[in-house]
């Protein structure tokens, strides 16, 4: 077996590397090239890069395509750019907008990985005769004794991206490889300098790639100009406190920017797209104890429906560590739920819920799903 767990010599193993133009994927290409693999770099053009050509900290736009091409030239590997704009708009951007209109808080990076990178790009890689598709994600995969591969949290907990990759299927894991899963970020940058890559000190991606300066409302207003529907801001106790210009300007857990002068700290507790109401309340009203998930992807060894009561750990935001919970199978709805050991604040429909075998730093990823509904830890008055 070679270093990618494939039964071929490196020089006989073709690996397509998804090159975003950042330091991580460029180092992956460099590592594999140094190990003697037949490396091909592919960069996806995902959106109209006119406004982003000179913007740093995004991915898959004009400057990033240039950086990826330059890295490939430095490493001496072939490089191709594929136009996936239409696919990306339909699968990711349009869905992102619709989710916000329906009062949800979507995680577009999960859908991009699921629908674009690990489905469409992977199919293209296989068409090119690739034995593996490698990415610069900080997550680990390992061969299982009985066959197949399992997904695990990365060595560097500060860089772990397993939350965004829970939707990776077993079939995709068989082909995907994540060489940075066992490296700390400072080692990645050291390798970039060793390889002579111009992106060695390029800043990491911060915002959602198609949302300039984090202003998602502008994206939604451009795509769905009729989406802004004025409505009331209502307290949990039934009081009407004010009005707003559209629920797309609010997210669950938000405190600032409510435009209320009540003398008490209030948070967005719920968004109701049917009535266009923004429901607010005290911080304790944000506590969630039960999460129902949909679009579930399960990577565990046993069927999910047979694991009612199984102790796990769950992550509802990328910036939070996994927290202890228990699986619950809702037989009436034929869907999974997780019961949190300690209530979480600010959990919103549309977010991702990643499930782990435990809350350890190298825990196995068991799958996850999109949060469909949450149950408050206390009874609400409205």
Swiss-Prot record:
Its main location: cytoplasm. It comes from the Bacteria. GO terms for cellular component: cytoplasm. The keyword Disulfide bond applies. ATP binds at residues 18-25, 44, 136. The keyword tRNA-binding applies. Pfam families: tRNA_Me_trans, tRNA_Me_trans_C, tRNA_Me_trans_M. The record marks 137, 351 as: Interaction with tRNA. It catalyses: S-sulfanyl-L-cysteinyl-[protein] + uridine(34) in tRNA + AH2 + ATP = 2-thiouridine(34) in tRNA + L-cysteinyl-[protein] + A + AMP + diphosphate + H(+). Its EC number is 2.8.1.13. GO terms for molecular function: ATP binding; tRNA binding; tRNA-uridine 2-sulfurtransferase activity. Disulfide bonds join 112-209. The active site is at 112 (nucleophile), 209 (cysteine persulfide intermediate). One of its GO terms (biological process) is tRNA wobble position uridine thiolation. Keywords: ATP-binding, Cytoplasm, Disulfide bond, Nucleotide-binding, RNA-binding, Transferase, tRNA processing, tRNA-binding. It is found in: Cytoplasm. Residues 159-161 are annotated as: Interaction with tRNA. HAMAP family: tRNA_thiouridyl_MnmA. Belongs to the MnmA/TRMU family. NCBIfam families: PRK00143.1, trmU. Catalyzes the 2-thiolation of uridine at the wobble position (U34) of tRNA, leading to the formation of s(2)U34. This is tRNA-specific 2-thiouridylase MnmA. It comes from Methylobacterium sp. (strain 4-46). The lineage of its organism: Bacteria, Pseudomonadati, Pseudomonadota, Alphaproteobacteria, Hyphomicrobiales.
């Amino acid at each position: 077996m070679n270093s990618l767990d494939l039964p071929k010599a490196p020089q006989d193993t073709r690996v397509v590397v998804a090159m975003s133009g950042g330091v991580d994927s460029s180092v992956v290409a460099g590592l594999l090239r140094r190990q003697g693999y037949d490396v091909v770099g592919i960069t996806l053009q995902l959106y109209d890069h006119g406004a982003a050509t000179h913007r740093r900290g995004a991915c898959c736009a004009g400057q990033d395509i240039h950086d990826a091409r330059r890295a490939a030239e430095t490493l001496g590997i072939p490089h191709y750019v594929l136009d996936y704009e239409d696919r990306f708009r339909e699968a990711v951007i349009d869905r992102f907008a619709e989710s916000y209109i329906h009062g949800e808080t979507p995680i577009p990076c999960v859908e991009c990985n699921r629908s674009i990178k690990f489905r469409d790009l992977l199919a293209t890689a296989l068409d090119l005769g690739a034995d593996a598709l490698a990415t610069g994600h900080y997550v680990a995969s390992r061969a299982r004794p009985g066959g197949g591969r399992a997904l695990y949290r990365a060595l560097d907990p500060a860089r772990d991206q397993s939350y965004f990759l829970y939707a990776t299927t077993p079939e995709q894991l068989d082909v995907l490889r994540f060489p940075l899963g066992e490296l700390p970020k400072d080692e990645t940058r050291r390798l970039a300098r060793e390889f002579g890559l111009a992106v060695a000190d390029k800043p990491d991606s911060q915002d959602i790639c198609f949302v300039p300066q984090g202003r998602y409302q502008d994206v939604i207003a451009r795509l769905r100009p009729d989406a802004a529907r004025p409505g009331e801001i209502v307290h949990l106790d039934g009081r009407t406190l004010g009005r707003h210009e559209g629920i797309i300007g609010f997210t669950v857990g938000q405190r600032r920017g409510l435009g209320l002068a009540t003398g008490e700290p209030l948070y967005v507790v719920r968004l109701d797209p049917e009535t266009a109401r923004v429901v607010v309340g005290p911080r304790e009203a944000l506590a969630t104890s039960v999460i129902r998930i949909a679009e579930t992807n399960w990577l565990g060894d046993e069927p999910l429906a047979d694991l009612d009561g199984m102790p796990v750990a769950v992550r509802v935001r990328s910036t939070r560590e996994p927290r202890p919970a228990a699986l619950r199978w809702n037989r009436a709805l034929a869907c999974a739920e997780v019961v949190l050991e300690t209530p979480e604040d600010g959990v919103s429909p549309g977010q991702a819920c990643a499930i782990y075998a435990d809350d350890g730093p190298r825990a196995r990823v068991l799958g996850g799903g999109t949060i469909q509904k949450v149950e408050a830890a206390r009874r609400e008055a409205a």
